[in-house]
Amino acid sequence: MAVAGAAYREPLVHWCTQQLQKTFALDVSEEIIQYVLSIENAEEIREYVTDLLQGNEGKKGQFIEDLITKWQKNDQEFISDSFQQCLRKDEILDGQRSVDQLKRSRRKGRNKQEVPAFPEPDVAVEVKTPLDLAKAQESNNSVKKKTRFVNLYTREGQDKLAVLLPGRHPCDCLGQKHKLINNCLVCGRIVCEQEGSGPCLFCGSLVCTNEEQDILQRDSNKSQKLLKKLMSGAETSGKVDVSTKDLLPHQESRMKSGLEKAIKHKEKLLEFDRTSIRRTQVIDDESDYFASDSNQWLSKVEREMLQKREEELRELRHASRLSKKVTIDFAGRKILEDENPLAEYHSRLDETIQAIASGTLNQSLVTLDRSCEEPLGVLVNPNMYQASPQWVDNTGSTPQKKTSLSAGPRLEPSLHQHQLRIQDQEFQEGFDGGWCLSMHQPWASLLVRGIKRVEGRSWYTPHRGRLWIAATGKRPSPQEVSELQATYRLLRGKDVEFPNDYPSGCLLGCVDLIDCLSQKQFQEQFPDISQESDSSFVFICKNPQEMVVKFPIKGNPKIWKLDSKIHQGAKKGLMKQNKAV
């Protein structure tokens, strides 16, 4: 029955296909139209076709009404024809019954009248040539062909349901319904076959397939023609203008209100970033007093301090009533009890927790331990736990110095400060921790050669002493080298000997970092060389040493530590160079 109904709807299917292609330029497969015509409700057909045409105005509405009229007429004809076919079948069955009765009567000899049998509907075709054989096979295949059902959840079914409009139209299928063209490299939009190759419908940059990209990279006449063809609609596509779309009034108002909220939120975030006010607070339950034993981040001193304070507070909270404070007022004849006996308990608890959370507990302990010692004076590092150096006089007045040192804390301030002064510059110069700084060429070679005396950075470093210099992997251009050499000829003089080559990606040598100054301090203390750097912080470098053999190395940002084996080899290379010099 389904096959007969599909065959009966073929003229209507053909009419729908032609109307959609000619009037609306829609390439819709026959399976979709047959599915629409198989719907039994006229309202469902009207709703489906309206969604397919994206509206029911003008010609679209007229087409929908014509389609429903033809569909109803077609169904009525189909019902009447099927009814007539049923009647014919009943007549045929009655005729067959009469023939059977005649045969039975003829067997009995009562009625000798012969009734002709029904002629065979199909006559065998005589096959004489290969063409006749092919025609016979086609007729057999057409008779045996059955209706094939396609699963809509497979790839084939999805392809048949997808509608591809002619031209480039915005589509939000994300490459699920249509074939994927590519992703926009600027905004990241997923462009499908419906949007097509060309300017991105959001940002306007070119989006094309991999095959088209290969053609464009050839830089030939064909690639220029293809580029011109793809970018032909760049003026009209570009960014999608919301005002050009057909929006309903409530959609337009909702979009405007959303835009206003987004602008207000942007201004709020910019204001927060401008003021940099702390508006959030992290509450860590592990740093609470009651979790002191389980907090793994506390040091041993902090844990002991908390346990001691916990015992004190427990005794204070569960103290005997005999130790309760009572005030007797003889003049007023009153006895006053302590109104809030746990006030001291809560105050001590809060002080301890706040000291641990802020990290000032260790500092308070250090200050308590230091309070009983002698004043520190002008030590470079006041937290150094070692005896202060003593002055050794080689002129023969050592006993007098010793007696003055044994005089106790009643010494003169100048003598006491002189005693506590630490001269650590030689120690820092002699100590090599293997710290390295990565620099671009040709500045790295000029610093190791001693032509460049300072190095500018946007960050401060507390490092002092030997600093290794490594060249990055970027090779300098001849123009950069010539410009930098001309600059340093003006600053240092014409007799400067520049290096012959500027190797990259290797360890060049080392310098001694004397100080790190701000730009203002640098201009005040070194006005002669203030033109060499205008950075926020300036490294003052002295004693440059270049390696004979440059080790290949990969740099890191800021100041980083060398590998121990490379560090030992670099120090040996410097020693060999010093001996050779």
UniProtKB/Swiss-Prot annotation:
Its domain description in UniProt is:
The C4-type zinc finger mediates a competitive interaction with UFSP2 and ligand-bound nuclear receptors. It also mediates interaction with the transcriptional coactivators and the basal transcription machinery.
Instruction: List every position bearing Phosphoserine.
Output: S276
Chain intervals for the UniProt region annotation (Mediates interaction with UFL1) = 300-400
What is the protein's name according to its record? Activating signal cointegrator 1
Q: Does the keyword Zinc-finger apply?
A: yes
> Which parts of the sequence carry N-acetylalanine?
A2
Recorded hits in InterPro entries, A to Z, give:
ASCH_domain, PUA-like_sf, TRI4_N, TRIP4-like, TRIP4/RQT4_C2HC5_Znf, TRIP4_3rd_dom
| Physiological role | Transcription coactivator which associates with nuclear receptors, transcriptional coactivators including EP300, CREBBP and NCOA1, and basal transcription factors like TBP and TFIIA to facilitate nuclear receptors-mediated transcription. May thereby play an important role in establishing distinct coactivator complexes under different cellular conditions. Plays a role in thyroid hormone receptor and estrogen receptor transactivation. Also involved in androgen receptor transactivation. Plays a pivotal role in the transactivation of NF-kappa-B, SRF and AP1.
Highest taxon above the source species: Eukaryota
Localization recorded for this chain is: Nucleus; Cytoplasm, Cytosol; Cytoplasm, Cytoskeleton, Microtubule organizing center, Centrosome
Annotated ASCH domain ranges read 437-531
Gene this protein is translated from:
Trip4
CDD domains in alphabetical order: ASCH_ASC-1_like
Segment Disordered: which positions? 100-121, 390-410
Quaternary arrangement and interactors, per the entry? Interacts with the thyroid hormone receptor/TR (via the ligand-binding domain); this interaction requires the presence of thyroid hormone. Interacts with the androgen receptor/AR; in an androgen, testosterone and dihydrotestosterone-dependent manner. Interacts with ESR1 (estrogen ligand-bound); competes with UFSP2. Interacts with UFSP2; competes with ligand-bound ESR1. Interacts with DDRGK1 and UFL1; the interaction with DDRGK1 is direct. Interacts with NCOA1. Interacts with EP300. Part of the ASC-1 complex, that contains TRIP4, ASCC1, ASCC2 and ASCC3.
Numbered residues of crosslink Glycyl lysine isopeptide (Lys-Gly) (interchain with G-Cter in UFM1):
K324, K334
Modified after translation how? Phosphorylated by NEK6.
Q: Where is this region: Mediates interaction with DDRGK1?
A: 200-300
Report where it is expressed, by tissue: Ubiquitously expressed. Expressed in the spinal cord, brain, paraspinal ganglia, thyroid, and submandibular glands. Expressed at low level in all the muscles (at protein level) but with higher expression in axial than in limb muscles.
Q: Phosphotyrosine modification sites?
A: Y289
Q: Where is the composition biased (Polar residues)?
A: 390-406
Q: Name one GO molecular function term.
A: protein kinase binding
Q: Name one GO biological process term.
A: rescue of stalled ribosome
